Amino acid sequence: ALGNESLKEYEANRAYPSRVITPKGEETAYGYDTVGRRLSISNTYGTVELAYNSRNFVTSRIDGEGYTTRRFYDRMGNLTTYYPPVQWEKKESGYEYRHDFLERVVDTISPLQEHHRVFRNFDGDITSRIHPVSYALKGEEGEGTRYEYDSDGNCIRILYPDGGVERRF
């Protein structure tokens, strides 16, 4: 825009840039492995390092300040656990993700053991979201936001836990 162009440099036989220089002179360098996965991103703020598993999913990210984020996956490639830097450093629990038989996330458990539970119909539409506090008290029967759909799959009504109703047309 307005004549400003970024300069991109490529290595031989690489589809991705190895270096980008912005119009303001800010430089970012990228490192790749032999199969083309990005392993590092470097600029004046530091270097971010990435690690992958055998299925090419990012499993580790170390930022410019040395903090590590970890991700774990099941055999189907679904994210099962995410550890932000604080939880990983202190060896505390991270975020857990539970999936249904169609590999959709149906429950997210935070490090504080809060459940963000979602129920879906056969079409994949969300029919209810259980509030974390209500889930702790009543489990699957807890209060939350409910959704109703017409025969075409359009959300026509949202029922809130306080009794409020939102209609959609």
Residue ranges of each PLM-predicted region?
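Beta-strand elements of repeat-based all-beta scaffolds
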Residues: A1-F169
